[in-house]
UniProtKB/Swiss-Prot annotation:
Molecular function terms, GO-annotated: RNA binding
Species in which this protein is naturally found: Arabidopsis thaliana
Protein's job: Binds the poly(A) tail of mRNA. Appears to be an important mediator of the multiple roles of the poly(A) tail in mRNA biogenesis, stability and translation. In the cytoplasm, affects both translation and mRNA decay. Inhibits the polyadenylated RNA degradation by the Rrp41p 3'-->5' exonuclease in vitro. Binds with the 5'UTRs of PAB2, PAB3 and with a lower affinity with the 5'UTR of PAB5.
GO cellular component: cytoplasm; nucleus
Further comment: A.thaliana contains 8 PABP genes.
SMART domains, sorted: PolyA, RRM, RRM_1
Record family assignment: Belongs to the polyadenylate-binding protein type-1 family.
Protein name: Polyadenylate-binding protein 3
Keyword Repeat: yes
Tissue: Expressed predominantly in immature flowers. Detected in tapetum and pollen. Strongly expressed in immatures siliques.
Compartments, as annotated in UniProt: Cytoplasm; Nucleus
InterPro entries listed in its UniProt record: Nucleotide-bd_a/b_plait_sf, PABP-dom, PABP_1234, PABP_HYD_C, RBD_domain_sf, RRM2_I_PABPs, RRM_dom, RRM_dom_euk
Length: 660
């Protein structure tokens, strides 16, 4: 028998339960299992200098843990894990300078009381595949209430190195009667099962077996049906009691218990449970009694489930129904945003009913009942939805242009965005400015690398990072790159001598505001303009380290290369329909061809540059400009102001007079 431990709880007293051949009472024979104090030997194959400390009191801080561990070994750092409100999560990590210090601290301080609560220390395992594999993990149930973490640890430590040991507790700190022990090796776990399963621990026979996940426990590997002995019965007549329940179900097998659930007044709640001794009897009762009439009621008989199982089953059922509904409405459900505040469900249905049979329309509201600016419209078939998308996308509703797209599930949208962002972040292969004859010129790169000899190589980049690199008005096939903005450090020493290859950047707040309003961008302060690669030597800023240029951001698109042949102006509805099915490159070209002659009426001298700047705006706003001459005139005026402010007094490329 092991001596009492520091916490006042003795290690579990274990005896075999051996039936006597001559008597009905069992004889308890002590088992000679050595229970020394736990000695942990450092495993040099997998050195670990970090410890996990669990079961911490909420008041425990880093300082408390540091003061506790510093007397045993040299502590490098301590971190108590907290939630977003800075409340302790009940565990911490302690880092040491070497694995031997960590093992020594674990051996000396494991289950030491801190704020009257023993702390549970084990090696920190950062590999989730090892932690969650279940290898070497055993389950112990029917534990006596007096057995705590330390007693369980000392009971099982003689079989091998323990990685984790825990007795399950309720919110009040009382034992739930079961626990888990994870060994470093599978052999140690098997030895503990062979020796301790069925033994008496503190006068209670315990079950010790391999840990099996909840999802796997309900099913046997060899049988497709769940294993169960407990049967749930509902829709019972009120006059049915336990005796009648036993009599009704007794024909299927031996019943170990039967109960009818009652309220506080003793009246039947019309459901109960029947527990059989064997699974075959329970399965037979479910098969033959489910749906049988008993009096005026039709019985429901099924396998008794835990609340967590029922919730999981209902969740799967509702999720499958949601997926089925979505698949039925695939392509027929529209997502709308930029809705005017005056639009409600009825008005939304009224607006879209002319394009087909609207099965549902919904404007999303905040908790105060105000519109969140987006909603959904569902049609009976995809053809009607596509017709509505073509006709209504970009249309002015109230004071806002409407944006419409096919609705996506959150999971699909997230997967699409993750794939897009991973493509953006992935470094592309280095390639020069070569391109197939007659094909579109690739857009300007995000980074340009310039070697000592000045030869430039441009990595290809995917679409979607601030501009459309596959097509840029202002770049004819075969031409070099157009205008770019090159960031430079804001705080630096004044430089002497001429700066080559740069226009003077804007320096006042008004210009930044106009640029943001016009182009819907927020360019970082400290940008200077570089006109092509021909100005100056290599187009290099002397403030940038030689050999590497910082990220290059495109200036407003120069539309000088848009075909000057006057394309016939299309009605907005027809143009919107064409844009919906066009690729991004064709979409920009089509918008440019329609916008160019409209801008030319207001500003024939700088029509190409102004058109390029306007093409940086959202498609819905461009369509609005085409419909509203006053709005177009205002935007053209803003664009000219931005161009006028950004021009150098000594530059005459734009044809502005500095005295204008």
């Amino acid at each position: 028998m092991a001596a009492a431990v520091a916490t006042g709880v003795a290690p579990a007293t274990m005896v075999d339960q051996v039936p006597s051949p001559t008597a009905q009472t069992s004889v308890q024979v002590p088992v000679s299992i050595p229970l020394p104090s736990p000695v942990v030997v450092a495993d040099q194959t997998h050195p670990n200098s970090s410890l996990y400390a669990g079961d911490l009191d909420p008041k425990v801080t880093e300082a408390h843990l540091f003061d506790l561990f510093k007397h045993v070994a040299n502590v490098v750092s301590v971190r108590v894990c907290r939630d977003q409100n800075r409340r302790s999560l009940g565990y911490a990590y302690i880092n040491f300078s070497n694995p031997n210090d960590a093992y020594r601290a674990m051996e000396a301080l494991n289950y030491t009381p801190l704020f009257d609560r023993p702390i549970r220390i084990m090696l920190s395992n950062r590999d989730p595949s090892t932690r969650l594999s279940g290898k070497g993990n055993i389950f112990i149930k029917n534990l006596d209430a007096s057995i705590d973490n330390k007693a369980l640890f000392e009971t099982f430590s003689s079989f091998g190195t323990i990685l984790s040991c825990k007795v399950a507790m309720d919110v009040t700190g009382r034992s739930k009667g079961y626990g888990f022990v994870q060994f470093e090796k599978e052999e140690s776990a098997q030895a503990a099962i062979d020796k301790l399963n069925g033994m008496l621990m503190n006068d209670k026979q315990v079950f010790v077996g391999h840990f099996i996940r909840r999802q796997e426990r309900a099913r046997d590997e060899n049988t497709p049906t769940p294993r169960f002995t407990n049967v749930y019965v509902k829709n019972l007549p009120k006059e049915i009691g336990e005796d009648e329940l036993r009599k009704t179900f007794g024909k299927f097998g031996v019943i170990s218990s039967a109960v009818v659930m009652r309220d506080q007044s003793g009246n039947s709640r019309c459901f109960g449970f029947v527990n059989f001794e064997c699974t075959e009897a329970a399965a037979s009762a479910v098969e033959k009694m489910n749906g049988i009439s008993l009096g005026d009621d039709v019985l429901y008989v099924g396998r008794a489930q835990k609340k967590s199982e029922r919730e999981e089953e209902l969740r799967r059922k509702f999720e499958q129904e949601r997926i089925n509904r979505f698949e039925k409405s695939q392509g027929a459900n529209l997502y709308l945003k930029n809705l005017d505040d005056s639009v409600d469900d009825e008005k939304l249905k009224e607006m879209f009913s002319e394009y087909g049979n609207v099965t549902s329309s919904k404007v999303m509201l905040n908790p105060q009942g105000m519109s969140r600016g987006f909603g959904f419209v569902a049609y009976s078939n995809p053809e009607e939805a596509l017709r509505a998308l073509s006709e209504m996308n970009g249309k002015m509703i109230g004071r806002k242009p409407l944006y419409i797209a096919l609705a996506q599930r959150k999971e699909d949208r997230r997967a699409h965005l993750q794939a897009l962002f991973s493509q953006i972040r992935a470094p592309g292969p280095m390639s020069g400015f070569h391109h197939p004859p007659g094909g579109p010129m690739p857009g300007p790169p995000q980074h340009m690398y310039v070697g000592q000899n000045g030869a430039s190589m441009v990595p290809s980049q995917p679409i979607g990072y601030g501009f459309q690199p596959q097509f840029m008005p202002g770049m004819r096939p075969g031409s070099g790159p157009g205008n770019f903005i090159v960031p430079y450090p804001l705080q630096r020493q004044p430089q002497t001598g001429p700066r080559m290859g740069f226009r003077r950047g804007a320096t006042n707040v008004q210009q930044h505001i106009q640029q943001q309003q016009l182009m819907h961008r927020n360019p970082s302060p400290g940008m200077r303009y570089m006109n092509g690669a021909s100005n100056g030597r290599n187009g290099m800023d002397s403030s940038v380290p030689q050999g590497i240029l910082p990220p290059i951001i495109p200036l407003p698109i120069d539309a000088s290369s848009i075909s000057h042949q006057k394309a016939p102006l299309l009605p907005i509805s027809k143009l919107t329909s064409s844009l919906a099915s066009a690729s991004p490159a064709d979409r920009t070209r089509m918008l440019g061809e329609q916008l160019y002659p409209l801008v030319e009426r207001h500003e024939p001298l700088h029509v190409a540059k102004v058109t390029g700047m306007l093409l940086e705006m959202d498609q819905a706003e461009i369509l609005h400009l085409m419909e509203s001459p006053e709005a177009l005139k205002s935007k053209v005026s803003e664009a000219l102001d931005v161009l006028r402010l950004s021009v150098d007094p000594t530059d005459h490329d734009l044809g502005f007079s500095t005295t204008d």
